[in-house]
């Protein structure tokens, strides 16, 4: 097993409240994420909080095995194999690469798998159908499929002169490949073009981002785990070029992109925890349809915009869920 395999074992009480499955001892739940960054950390925390809110209290009735693959697919496979060797009762796999590794290792097993923050579970072969996951293993979960077309329209709304959009992505991530394909198709319909810059590791993100300088009018990064883990490199390239940078991850706003869009990943974790609770109380994964999170929001970074001399249109400011200004994130107050 690789040295960078990190497993932290903690314990929590999981009360079955007299219904559902009966376990001969503490329930063991393996939770693995592909890398450490705020969005995936928020998912993990949301899962645990959801179970707590459902009445599953901390103690000795459940053991969480929490692991981080540090961006390495081989390590993700090793983690899944370790979970299997420890006879976990359920696995929560956070992000597409982790879910793929877990599904491969547990293929043919009765151990339930619940994925989270997976872009396209059908295209990546995790399930055969969103409404009926049966037929492809003991797996279901929650997707964070983003609206790529909406993001591209937002860039055009921000600056009508934008024609070429650079996308930094890891071709080794199935989720990124899928979203890049969608972006190319949607951009063509809008009179835009996509310029690809590939980075197969965090070490290569800077080179990929720098290659876009002078070639594009804006940068767009989707839910790519590799690139988000090296977001500073993309921010630096966008600032040097003096162009907008839209990141499809709200948790990344404070790190410097001009715009961040997408879902509340803590809520993604809450939804995932709800699925886990259903399974622990007796439902089979193939009886639970895949959940697609809704309610994507727009977040603006005025500090980043100031650095490139950009002023947000009032129409966009009015629909922003939050604005970062003066180093402080200002949340929009909800009105009845």
Where are these regions (language model features)?
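Short hydrophobic alpha-helices and adjacent helix-cap/hinge residues
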Residues: 2-9, 18-336
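Repetitive helical segments and hydrophobic/amphipathic motifs
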Residues: 12-13
């Amino acid at each position: 097993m690789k040295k960078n395999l990190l497993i932290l074992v903690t314990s929590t009480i999981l009360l079955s409240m007299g219904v559902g499955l009966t376990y001969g001892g503490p329930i063991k739940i393996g939770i693995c994420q592909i890398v450490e960054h705020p969005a995936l950390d928020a998912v993990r925390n949301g899962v645990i909080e959801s179970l707590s809110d459902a009445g599953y209290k901390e103690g000795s009735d459940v053991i969480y095995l929490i692991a981080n693959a540090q961006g390495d697919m081989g390590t993700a496979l090793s983690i899944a194999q370790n979970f299997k060797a420890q006879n976990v009762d359920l696995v929560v796999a956070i992000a597409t690469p982790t879910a793929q590794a877990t599904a491969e290792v547990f293929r043919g097993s009765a151990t339930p798998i619940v994925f989270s923050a997976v872009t396209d579970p059908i295209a990546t072969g995790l399930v055969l159908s969103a409404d009926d996951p049966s037929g492809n293993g003991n797996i279901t979960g929650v997707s964070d499929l983003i609206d790529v077309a909406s993001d591209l329209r937002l860039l055009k709304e921000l600056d009508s002169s934008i024609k070429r959009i650079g996308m930094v992505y890891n071709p080794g991530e199935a989720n990124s490949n899928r979203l890049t394909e969608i972006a190319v198709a949607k951009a063509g319909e809008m009179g835009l073009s996509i310029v690809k810059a590939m980075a197969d590791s965090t070490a290569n993100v800077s080179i990929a981002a720098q290659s876009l300088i002078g070639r594009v009018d804006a940068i767009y990064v989707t839910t790519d785990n590799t690139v988000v883990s090296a977001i500073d490199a993309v921010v630096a390239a966008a600032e040097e070029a003096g162009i907008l940078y839209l990141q499809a991850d709200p948790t990344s706003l404070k790190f410097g992109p001009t715009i961040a869009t997408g879902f509340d990943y803590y809520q993604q974790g809450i939804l995932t925890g709800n699925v886990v609770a259903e399974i622990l109380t007796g439902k089979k994964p193939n009886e639970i349809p895949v959940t697609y999170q809704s309610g994507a929001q727009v977040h603006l970074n005025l500090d980043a915009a100031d650095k490139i001399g950009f002023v947000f249109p009032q129409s966009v400011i009015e629909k922003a869920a939050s604005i970062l200004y003066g180093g402080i994130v200002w949340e929009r107050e909800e009105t009845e």
